[in-house]
């Protein structure tokens, strides 16, 4: 090694005598290597293939390179920002014209829920029951609920009162459309749980499925969950109640003719229902907003574990006070085309079918005897 360095020393010159240094370097002795070094080819796409979820289209299109799908992303209907705005406006106007359109309500809930999803997710993660819901993801419908068992509970229990409320209002938990616009499993379950819990809010707030009751519940949801769909529905319900109240007023022509004839203006024996709803709404809105802002996050409640609990105890625990006035119960929906308008109720259909089966079985037993 010393001989090599000694022979190489006069070849590498410094200072002013190094003008031919580049040519002298070619005469340096070469050292043979035992393993040839091969340089691996490097391409711009080798970094993109590190992530197994990165689409190949993002390697060629730099505009989509920053968009990587989440691991829990599910099949959904893709929408752009402009598309969501148009769907929000269209579904809101459609619901204002016909509030019984459940498909429009589901669409409005999904396409407008973007700003509030983080708040809902934070509310569920803040409690142990909410975190358990996000892991187990149970559902409330006629296939997961033992209707016969809940109907056998004594009055005052949450499960029994829920069944009685369904009977009184002619509704059920199965009229919920799929959340086809949500991109991830987590967001899809948030919307599903929000919609499945809506009837429980009615029950705890003592509100029927009427125009007044629905509007009050939407004000409650707006104060507690900041859901845009709750704001749209609350504003739409208020406008409809206000329009009904204005239409019940005497026409100007009637007032003028009554004044000219010096006859008393037409009076009703009692206050019209529309005017009564408007007066009740003015009283119930502050109460609903106050209860919504002070009660516990109901989105994280495991209703499946509350069937046998006392409903009044639950109201005290959730800090839900009684309404300042009593709201009239549901008296049935108007019929259109010979059919009653309303949400489908598979629970009531199940009870009716079971009753018919029992009657048929009794007839069979009697015929055998």
Swiss-Prot record:
Compartments, record wording: Mitochondrion inner membrane
Family: Belongs to the COQ4 family.
Naturally occurring in which organism (per UniProt): Mycosarcoma maydis (Corn smut fungus)
InterPro entries noted in UniProt: Coq4, Coq4_euk
Composition skew (Polar residues), residue ranges: 19-33, 47-66
Role noted for this protein: Lyase that catalyzes the C1-decarboxylation of 4-hydroxy-3-methoxy-5-(all-trans-polyprenyl)benzoic acid into 2-methoxy-6-(all-trans-polyprenyl)phenol during ubiquinone biosynthesis.
Reactions the enzyme catalyzes: a 4-hydroxy-3-methoxy-5-(all-trans-polyprenyl)benzoate + H(+) = a 2-methoxy-6-(all-trans-polyprenyl)phenol + CO2
Binding site for Zn(2+): 198-199, 202, 214
Pfam families: Coq4
Feature: compositional bias, Basic residues: 332-343
Keywords assigned: Lyase, Membrane, Metal-binding, Mitochondrion, Mitochondrion inner membrane, Transit peptide, Ubiquinone biosynthesis, Zinc
Listed name of the protein: Ubiquinone biosynthesis protein COQ4, mitochondrial
Organelle transit peptide residues: 1-28
Broad class of enzyme this protein falls into: lyase
Keyword Metal-binding: yes
Keyword Transit peptide: yes
GO cellular component, one term: extrinsic component of mitochondrial inner membrane
EC number annotated for this UniProt entry: 4.1.1.130
A GO BP entry: ubiquinone biosynthetic process
Topology in membrane: Peripheral membrane protein
Residue span of region Disordered: 1-70, 330-369
